[in-house]
Amino acid sequence: MKIKPCKSQVFRLEPIIGSRKYINYFWSFSIFFGAFGFLIVGICSYLKKELFFFSAENIIFIPQGAVMCFYGIAGIFLSFYLWFTMILGVGSGFNEFNKNEGIVNIFRWGFPGQNRRIKICCLIKDIKSIRIYIRDGISPRSALYLKIRGMPDIPLDVIEDRFNLNEIEKRATELASFLRVPIEGLE
């Protein structure tokens, strides 16, 4: 189910992509094929034969071949995990702000089980502020949080693009003016 963004004077609907990002598809393919190569080379070192394009003449099975098999199996499981989260759409959902009813609904899909559907409802009048979080360094990250009385901060969106500070500020300003609340976190 694809949700289209909707903005008006009294209603906002913001879709959240979650784990279905292009970079996750890239990494799941890359990890799978790299791990598959490790596994094939490990098997070739055990059988002392060439399979496909993989040659393991100079690799002794114990310890190098066994370690390559282990890394290959671990990488394949990791790529299956990434595919599983993307197929299920973990982290995807929507943020709904409705001034007519005076409520905010935040919905996300989780992993299968008891808490597969994560839904948070609150009143607009209970919102204290919009908080901007920015972390620089090796893995930069930016996020918008909703600060609500009596609840922990709720992440609205995570933006992993390090050069898009203007977009983060713009989104926070639009949402804060829509909800008529202050912005925190920018110095």
Swiss-Prot record:
TM annotation in the entry: 23-43, 70-90
InterPro entries named in the record: PSI_Ycf4_assembly
Keyword hit for Transmembrane: yes
Record keywords: Chloroplast, Membrane, Photosynthesis, Plastid, Thylakoid, Transmembrane, Transmembrane helix
Membrane topology designation: Multi-pass membrane protein
Pfam families per the UniProt record, alphabetical: Ycf4
Protein name, UniProt field: Photosystem I assembly protein Ycf4
Gene that specifies this protein: ycf4
